[in-house]
Design a protein with these regions (language model features):
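Carbohydrate transferase catalytic cores enriched for Leloir-type hexosyltransferases
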Residues: 104-113, 185
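Histidine-centered active-site/metal-ligand motif
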Residues: 56, 60, 95, 106, ...
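Nucleotidyltransferase catalytic core that binds NTPs
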Residues: 213-364
Length: 364
């Protein structure tokens, strides 16, 4: 990963140096300072490194930048070619700057960030070309006559839908599935098939039809991490991260006491972001039965110590009494989290703010 970031940094520095050197007159309002450029680059890398990104991440950024080196994009003699190359590179850096899978205005938010970062340095005309290219990535297909900056960014960004390598397409599918894991599989499947069908109509790539069949028939392996999570804390998150390596997806099942309920809804803000969260107030076996309409479900139980092990063995034995088909896995938290518990945190809440070190706000 470090090699990729070094390559990406080289491309960024070359872009900024190019803008400072070649964008004379109207396009360059003020020279971009080196320290400011460094600050913006670090901010961009931080965004593309967000944990909920599996496809729209550093690797994706690297691949697009690498793609600008391909000869095919520069065979035509475009006037002021250096200017449009710099626009393409700047558009690449910002095209997925904001990526919130459940939102439909990521492109608009991304261009706003780009404009805020460069309005003091670049002309409205220069920024407008970059903005339009980023907003155009909402479309699957772009032609050269639509604008060369738009065309190159679109061609690089949608390269995967032209792939004839089924392994590559399956890797893409798994990454997108993880990015949209906030949704139930039935909802994800419907939206994904709609997108892939549209992509096939545009590209005539028959491999996409094979991918449609895969998505339609898939039954993802899911870990169901159940608990009261009142609140969800760093120890829970440690178990969750380990479980992510074992399953296609992990669903958080929040148990609600049907007699007491949850009068205080504050617990929700400590739950992880970009996850499918389900509340249940009946037997967990009923929840499993419902989820198994779409998923191959395995119960996840977290352990801190030997005392937890005895409790969990009894818990699993009870589940087996209720249904013989239950699958489960026990995951031991790392030693630095063995002392953390929700009851400890609730106790601290009464006297001090030190409890905040033990909870998370999504992935932050």
């Amino acid at each position: 990963m470090n090699d990729k970031i070094e390559f990406i940094k080289l491309a960024w520095d070359s872009c900024i140096d190019g803008i400072n050197s070649f964008c004379k007159g109207g396009d360059l309002k003020n020279k971009i300072p080196e320290e400011y450029s460094e600050k913006i680059f670090n901010k961009i890398i931080e965004k593309y490194s967000e944990p909920h990104r599996y496809w729209h991440n550093i690797d994706h950024l690297y691949k697009l930048i690498e793609g600008t080196l391909e000869k095919e994009f520069f065979e035509c003699d475009y006037q002021h070619s250096k200017h449009f190359i710099m626009k393409v590179v700047l558009a690449i850096f910002y095209h997925d700057y904001v990526y919130e899978p459940e939102k439909s205005n990521n492109e608009e938010k991304s261009v706003k960030e780009m404009s805020n970062d460069f309005y003091e340095y670049l002309s409205n005309t220069f920024l407008s070309d970059v903005k339009e290219a980023i907003l155009n990535t909402k479309n699957l297909v772009t032609k050269p006559e639509d604008g060369i900056v738009k065309y190159i960014l679109s061609k690089l960004d949608t390269d995967i839908i032209y792939s004839s390598d089924m392994n590559e397409l399956l890797y893409w599918e798994n990454c997108i599935f993880k990015e949209y894991q906030i949704y139930s599989y039935s909802k994800y499947r419907d939206g994904r098939i709609k997108f892939l069908t549209k992509a096939y109509i545009e590209t005539k790539n028959r491999k996409l039809l094979e991918l449609v069949e895969f998505v339609n028939n898939r039954k993802p392996r899911v870990g169901l991490y159940v608990g009261s999570f009142n609140p969800f804390h760093v120890g829970h998150n440690n178990i969750l991260k380990q479980a992510d390596k074992l399953f296609d997806k992990v669903i958080i099942g929040v148990g609600i006491n049907p007699d007491k309920g949850r009068k205080n809804e504050d617990y929700k803000k400590y739950l992880p972001e970009y996850r499918e969260i389900v509340e249940y107030s009946s037997l967990v076996t009923e929840l499993i039965k419902k989820l198994e309409e779409d998923y191959d479900v395995t119960i996840i139980r977290g352990l801190r110590n030997a005392s937890d092990l005895e409790y969990e063995k009894n818990y699993i034995s009870t589940l087996k009494d209720l249904t013989n088909e239950v699958k489960y896995v026990m995951i031991l938290s790392d030693v630095e989290f063995h002392h953390v518990s929700s009851s400890m945190i609730r106790g601290l809440m009464k006297f001090t703010d030190s409890w905040k070190q033990y909870v998370i706000g999504g992935y932050k």
